[in-house]
């Protein structure tokens, strides 16, 4: 089956697409949130631009890897594992050859999203964000695609901030990222809010953790 890649500039977000993406991104980030028990708040609490800390939406992008339109029904409360099972059952194989910048209708887009990956503009280039995958062996393809987008928009480096306790460092090293620094993140014992980290405001955690800054040269 042939899927397609939708590349959206974040300044072009429409309300219906943002609503779908909030559900999808939270579902994707809930998987490590529940598995490792470090972060206690959803990834998106208010809006995409605010919670992803997007300062320059004109130069920030998100790619959606879409399955073909079908009768799959994705419920708001479905877990990442449940969504993956639904997609594999319907589409044992999916390839991607078509790129688009918009859809005519976003009303059912959530039931097609196999994965998402974005880059946001920062002073040093771009930073990886909104990385979710609900289909086997898709992560590498999404990485390759978004690195290509980074090159096209003139970035020389892509930064990734990852939580060490989520066991992500080796995954990024496999994709030619190198570790730059580690930052201990403490929580306020009373409020459970994370103190003085690179994360957006309002993040609560169940325990102290470590952020790892990683970099890939394009």
Predicted regions and their residues:
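Conserved GNAT-fold acetyl-CoA-binding loop/helix
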Residues: 26-63, 67-90
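Conserved beta-strand-loop-alpha-helix junction that forms the acyl-donor binding cleft
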Residues: 133-135, 159-173, 178, 182-194
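Glycine-rich phosphate-binding loop
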Residues: 136-142
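Conserved acetyl-CoA binding element of GNAT-fold acetyltransferases
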Residues: 97, 106-110, 115-136, 161-162
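Conserved GNAT acetyl-CoA-binding A-motif
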Residues: 125, 150-167
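A conserved short alpha-helix in the GNAT/GCN5 acetyltransferase fold that borders
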Residues: 142-152
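Short hydrophobic/aromatic beta-strand or adjacent loop that forms the aromatic wall/cage
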Residues: 59-60, 206-215
């Amino acid at each position: 089956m042939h899927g397609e890649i939708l590349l959206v500039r974040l300044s072009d977000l429409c309300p219906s697409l943002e609503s779908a993406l909030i559900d999808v991104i939270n579902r994707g980030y809930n998987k490590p949130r529940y598995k490792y028990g470090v972060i206690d708040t959803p990834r998106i609490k208010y809006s995409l631009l605010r919670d992803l800390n997007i300062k320059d939406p004109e130069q920030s992008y998100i790619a959606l890897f879409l399955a073909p339109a079908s009768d799959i029904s994705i419920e708001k409360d479905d877990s990442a594992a449940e969504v993956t099972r639904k997609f594999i059952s319907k589409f044992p194989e999916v390839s991607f050859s078509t790129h688009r910048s918009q859809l005519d209708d976003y009303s059912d887009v959530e039931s097609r999203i196999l994965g998402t990956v974005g880059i946001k503009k920062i002073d040093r280039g771009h930073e990886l964000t909104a990385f979710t995958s609900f289909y086997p062996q898709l992560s590498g393809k999404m990485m390759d695609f978004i690195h290509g987008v980074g090159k096209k928009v003139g970035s020389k480096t892509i930064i990734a901030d990852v939580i060490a306790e989520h066991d992500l460092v080796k995954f990024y090293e496999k994709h030619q990222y190198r570790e730059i620094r580690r930052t201990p993140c403490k929580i306020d014992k009373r409020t459970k809010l994370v103190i003085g980290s690179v994360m957006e405001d309002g993040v609560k955690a169940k325990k102290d953790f470590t952020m790892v800054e990683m970099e890939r040269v394009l």
